[in-house]
Structure formats: structure tokens, C-alpha cells
């Protein structure tokens, strides 16, 4: 049997994790220096409202101990492990889990332990994990699942708009001057995950409506198979997420649309008001 593992940056709701038997390892975070209890349900509205009011959020990677404690019981009962994790372009988490996996391979030479960098975050990671878990539940072998996951990683496209450029400035994505000017001019950048899993600016739009129209246009122009699943994540912007989902249906999307409040781990770096769209495509912008 193959056990699927991921991290909380994959943004998968608890019911889906339970349905597919997915184990979630957790990156942790603090708000104004106070550790947050990650065992409690995430209150996205309160989290992003605190950020809007100036709260300082800092995140930490999964510890080696946490990774080891999650994997050892699975290996002890004779199962294999496939971990699909947060992009190495924005976090060292996948690398850290890889180190633990190598240690465990030496202790469990008969077990198959794989660690794959999704080069994504939120549902750009989560949608891939769901398909891998579905394949594992159906008894698909490890090599076939890994090949499929790598194929999906190469096709996943992640585009998002942000409301306030200061969070990108803090993360070194924009200069302070550019962030200040952008705020004055109501410039809303459209960003994307590049082939290496790093965040880059795709375009800059005037106002949120134009930025959302651009997200919809990207879907219309790039997606070859409109029956494929799509992901939407929002940072305390549920009405806009619903509007985006409706617009996707009008644009011909017939696949499942999974919409979630964006998790805090990468949400800390994009800030409140972020709206993201995740889909599969053969092309890049």
C-alpha cells in the first residue's frame, strides 16, 4: 500500500484528506511572535484581518522530527510513502523532508519512500496530491503514480492577483518604491508560479476588476481540456472567489471547481485580498 503525504500548504480541506487517506504534515507560524495552535481549524477571516491591521506573521518549515514521526509508523506496518510537497522555489520544506526520507531509506531498505517537489502552493499543489491519492487508493503502483505526478507538475499553472503590494515588498518581490507607487495607482499585479516554482510578475492591471478579468482570460486562452479540475483560493475574499467560479462556468469549464480560503503558510507572504486560480495547461505565459 502507498501512503500519500503532503503539507498544510496544499490547502486541502479535512474532509478531502480523510476521504483519500492523505496525511498532512504542518508548517507552523506565529502572529506577532505568538505561536498559533495548528491543530485548531484555520479562521481565515480573522487571520487576514489581523494581517490587514499590521500583524506580523512568520512561518517555519516542517521539523525533521515531525516528518520522521509521520513516516515511521507507515513504514513499520509495511507500507510505502509518497510525499508531494510545497514548492522548493518558495520554501526549503521539501528539501528538509528529503533529508529525513534518505535517513529512513537506510533504516527501511525494503520500503519505497519518494519525495516530490510540486513546484506549487495551495491548490497548485493540492490538486496534484488529490489525483495521486486517488490513484493510490485504486492500487496503482508507485512508478505509475510518480510518472503521472511529474506530468501534472509540468502542466499545473498558478496565477494570482494581490490586493496590497506591501506583502510582496516584504518578501522581496517588489521594491519599496514600486510598491508605494502601485498602491497609489491601484495597480494590481498578476503573478504566476514559473517552471521552477518561483513567483514572478506576469502583468500589472489597473484595479481589481481588470485583474480578475485577466485571470478569466488566462483560463479561456490557455486551457485545452475544460473538463479538467480547477482550483480557486482566496485570502478572505469569498464573494470574488464565487464570482470567479461563476465566470469560469460561463467560459466553458465543466470540470470540478474546488474553492478554498487560502492557507496561512503562503498566505502570510501574499496578504489579504489575494485571489488565485489553478488549472492545467500545456502552454505558458
Predicted segments, located by residue:
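N-terminal glycine-rich phosphate/adenylate-binding segment common to multiple enzyme folds
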Residues: 66-97
Amino acid at each position: 500500500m502507498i501512503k500519500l503525504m503532503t503539507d498544510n500548504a496544499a490547502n486541502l480541506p479535512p474532509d478531502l484528506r480523510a476521504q483519500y487517506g492523505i496525511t498532512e504534515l504542518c508548517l507552523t507560524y506565529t502572529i506577532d511572535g505568538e505561536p498559533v495552535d495548528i491543530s485548531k481549524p484555520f479562521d481565515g477571516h480573522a487571520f487576514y484581518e489581523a494581517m490587514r491591521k499590521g500583524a506580523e506573521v512568520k512561518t517555519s518549515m516542517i521539523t525533521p522530527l515531525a516528518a520522521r514521526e509521520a513516516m515511521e509508523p507507515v513504514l513499520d506496518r509495511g507500507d510505502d510513502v509518497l510525499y508531494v510537497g510545497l514548492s522548493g522555489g518558495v520554501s526549503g520544506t521539501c528539501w528538509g523532508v528529503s533529508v529525513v526520507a534518505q535517513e529512513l531509506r537506510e533504516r527501511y531498505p525494503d520500503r519505497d519512500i519518494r519525495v516530490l517537489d510540486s513546484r506549487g502552493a495551495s491548490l497548485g499543489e493540492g490538486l496534484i496530491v488529490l489525483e495521486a491519492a486517488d490513484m493510490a487508493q485504486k492500487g496503482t503502483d508507485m512508478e505509475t503514480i510518480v510518472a503521472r505526478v511529474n506530468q501534472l507538475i509540468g502542466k499545473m499553472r498558478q496565477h494570482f492577483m494581490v490586493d496590497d503590494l506591501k506583502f510582496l515588498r516584504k518578501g522581496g518581490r517588489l521594491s519599496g518604491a514600486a510598491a508605494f507607487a502601485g498602491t497609489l495607482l491601484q495597480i494590481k499585479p498578476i503573478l504566476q508560479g514559473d517552471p521552477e516554482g518561483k513567483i514572478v510578475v506576469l502583468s500589472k492591471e489597473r484595479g481589481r476588476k481588470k485583474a480578475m478579468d485577466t485571470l478569466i482570460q488566462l483560463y479561456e486562452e490557455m486551457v485545452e481540456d475544460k473538463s479538467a479540475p480547477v482550483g480557486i483560493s482566496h485570502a478572505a475574499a469569498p464573494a470574488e472567489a464565487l464570482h470567479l467560479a461563476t465566470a469560469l462556468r460561463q467560459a466553458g469549464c465543466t470540470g470540478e471547481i474546488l474553492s478554498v480560503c487560502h492557507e496561512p503558510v503562503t498566505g502570510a507572504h501574499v496578504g489579504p485580498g489575494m485571489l488565485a486560480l489553478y488549472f492545467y495547461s500545456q502552454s505558458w505565459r
